[in-house]
Amino acid sequence: MADLAKIEEQLSSLTLMQAAELVKMLEEKWCVSAAAPVAVAAAGAAPAAEAVAEKTEFEIVLIAAGDKKVEVIKAVKDITGLGLIEAKKLVDEAPKLMKSNVKKAEAEEIKGKLEAAGAKVELK
């Protein structure tokens, strides 16, 4: 037991960087991974999980313009290809569906641009 107490004391004195290095060394030596084990879902829950994972198309909903309304209107105009009047109308009518059937990567990019302009956006 005294040996274990010494080991515990030594491990407690390690810095975060030293502890991470120790973990890597032990993983290599013992051919293991320190990653948390993934629980296997029950058979009945699997189809629901697959349905969520398969979602590839999203709707972009403009929730609110925020404080920078002019910048949001410009961003909406650029993203949708609408004219200035139509883009302003869309922003004024928020919450409003902006685009639908958008791939995940494109939806995330559009959301980022709108949020950078000051808008509040939701992906559905």
From Swiss-Prot:
<dbReference type="GO" id="GO:0005737">
    <property type="term" value="C:cytoplasm"/>
</dbReference>
<dbReference type="GO" id="GO:0006412">
    <property type="term" value="P:translation"/>
</dbReference>
<dbReference type="GO" id="GO:1990904">
    <property type="term" value="C:ribonucleoprotein complex"/>
</dbReference>
<protein>
    <recommendedName>
        <fullName>Large ribosomal subunit protein bL12</fullName>
    </recommendedName>
</protein>
<dbReference type="InterPro" id="IPR008932">
    <property type="entry name" value="Ribosomal_bL12_oligo"/>
</dbReference>
<dbReference type="InterPro" id="IPR000206">
    <property type="entry name" value="Ribosomal_bL12"/>
</dbReference>
<keyword id="KW-0687">Ribonucleoprotein</keyword>
<keyword id="KW-0689">Ribosomal protein</keyword>
<dbReference type="Pfam" id="PF00542">
    <property type="entry name" value="Ribosomal_L12"/>
</dbReference>
<comment type="subunit">
    <text>Homodimer. Part of the ribosomal stalk of the 50S ribosomal subunit. Forms a multimeric L10(L12)X complex, where L10 forms an elongated spine to which 2 to 4 L12 dimers bind in a sequential fashion. Binds GTP-bound translation factors.</text>
</comment>
<comment type="function">
    <text>Forms part of the ribosomal stalk which helps the ribosome interact with GTP-bound translation factors. Is thus essential for accurate translation.</text>
</comment>
<dbReference type="InterPro" id="IPR013823">
    <property type="entry name" value="Ribosomal_bL12_C"/>
</dbReference>
<comment type="similarity">
    <text>Belongs to the bacterial ribosomal protein bL12 family.</text>
</comment>
<dbReference type="GO" id="GO:0003735">
    <property type="term" value="F:structural constituent of ribosome"/>
</dbReference>
<dbReference type="GO" id="GO:0003729">
    <property type="term" value="F:mRNA binding"/>
</dbReference>
<dbReference type="InterPro" id="IPR036235">
    <property type="entry name" value="Ribosomal_bL12_oligo_N_sf"/>
</dbReference>
<dbReference type="Pfam" id="PF16320">
    <property type="entry name" value="Ribosomal_L12_N"/>
</dbReference>
<dbReference type="GO" id="GO:0005840">
    <property type="term" value="C:ribosome"/>
</dbReference>
<dbReference type="InterPro" id="IPR014719">
    <property type="entry name" value="Ribosomal_bL12_C/ClpS-like"/>
</dbReference>
